[in-house]
Regions:
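Glycine-rich anion-binding loops of enzyme active sites
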Residues: 77-166
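Helix N-cap motif at beta-to-alpha junctions
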Residues: 266-272
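Extreme N-terminal cap/leader segments of soluble proteins
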Residues: 1-55, 105-106, 110, 313-319
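General beta-strand structural signal in soluble alpha/beta enzymes
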Residues: 27-29, 47-48, 113-116, 154-156, ...
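Short, acidic (Asp/Glu-rich) active-site segment that either coordinates a divalent metal cofactor
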Residues: 142-197
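Acidic, Ser/Thr/Pro-rich beta/coil linker or hinge segments at domain junctions
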Residues: 279-319
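Small-aliphatic-rich amphipathic alpha-helix that forms the alpha element of a beta-alpha
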Residues: 56-81, 98-111, 195-199, 215-221
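Active-site-proximal betaalpha loop/short-helix elements
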Residues: 90, 184-259
């Protein structure tokens, strides 16, 4: 079944097998954590790797955003990328499209593609693109740093990545006007969280960029890794009109679908208002959507408690 491994399998077969220990590894592989923190002299290097295996039409652009977001959400300043592109055939037009997207998005975000690997692989039915991103950080910020009393902030809105994917890979399923469809496609230009992460990193107790499972899935990962309850007001979670329309067309919940473009952050209650004002000054939409409480690891929303990872609603469209 499409999607992330369950926690038990991940823990048993992946997270327990990490090779030789190294004292310079400050933060290694763990559930819900998307980047490693490595001591390099007096500096902290943040490194992350992430594949794009389902979305097809904007795979190169999406890959750059997803990989760099993981570094930014961990407090790093994304700088270099390593790119692996696997193709089902040697179609030069397909490769041209992917590498042009990688090049354009990297240049737009100020990132350098420093190396990588490209080959044709028998048995694939679509291209795969996996990027590794690295950058230095003044302060590492984990997914699981939330503390009781913190406030939960969300930038931009839910389902931004899903909006773009639906408007390209699944446009034939959307009953949208040409204007609304064009607006939905522009979601791909709003996927980077580097600007807001730079604002929040100095004070955030935890940060996470929601991807699979959407904003709700990201919140669950923050709650489980921090061993806290996160109480969320669904009505406070911003959903753009084009996102709502696209999700309604395929009957998926905007809070449970591909969420790149949003950044979740927990901050001390005394810092929340100031951070929202600073983000607004930078032209970044952000709202407070909840609070962190003592209790079993869970997300409380809509009179329900979510204690397990969320399966992304988009997966059913590919399965």
């Amino acid at each position: 079944m499409t999607g992330k491994l369950d926690r038990e399998t991940l823990s048993t077969l992946v997270l327990s097998r990490t090779g030789a220990p190294n004292p310079d590894l400050l933060a290694g592989p763990a559930f819900g954590e998307d980047a490693a923190a490595i001591r390099v002299g007096d500096e902290t290097l943040i490194a992350s790797t992430d594949p794009i295996s389902l979305a097809a039409e904007r795979i190169g652009q999406l890959a750059v955003a997803v990989a760099s977001n993981d570094v930014a959400a961990s407090g790093g300043r994304p700088e270099f990328l390593l790119s692996t592109v696997l193709l089902p055939d040697a179609d030069p037009d397909r490769l041209d499209t992917i590498t042009a997207q990688l090049d354009a998005e990297s240049e737009r975000l100020g990132l350098t593609v420093a190396g990588g690997h490209t080959e044709v692989v028998a048995g694939l039915d679509r291209p795969l693109c996996s990027l590794t991103c690295v950058g230095l950080a003044d302060r590492y910020v984990s997914t699981g740093g939330a503390r009781p009393g913190d406030r939960v902030l969300l930038t931009k809105g839910a389902g931004i990545e899903a909006t773009g994917v639906l408007a390209t890979d699944f446009r034939d399923r959307l009953d949208l006007s040409a204007t609304d469809l064009d607006r939905a496609v522009t979601a791909f230009d709003d996927l980077s969280v580097m600007p807001e992460a730079a604002v929040l990193a100095p004070v955030a107790t935890g940060m996470h960029d929601p991807t699979e499972g959407g904003v709700l899935g990201g919140l669950v990962e923050m709650a489980l890794t921090a061993d806290v309850t996160v109480a969320v007001d669904r009505d406070a979670v911003h959903v753009r009109p084009e996102t709502r329309a696209a999700c309604d067309a395929v009957d998926v919940d905007p809070l449970r679908v591909l969420g790149s473009g949003a950044l979740l952050a927990t901050v001390d209650a005394d810092d929340a208002e100031g951070m929202l004002e600073t983000l607004d000054d930078e032209g970044i939409d952000a709202v407070e959507i909840g609070r962190v409480e003592r209790g079993e690891p869970a997300v409380a929303i809509d009179y329900e408690r979510h204690t397990e990872p969320i399966r992304d609603g988009m997966y059913a469209l590919w399965d």
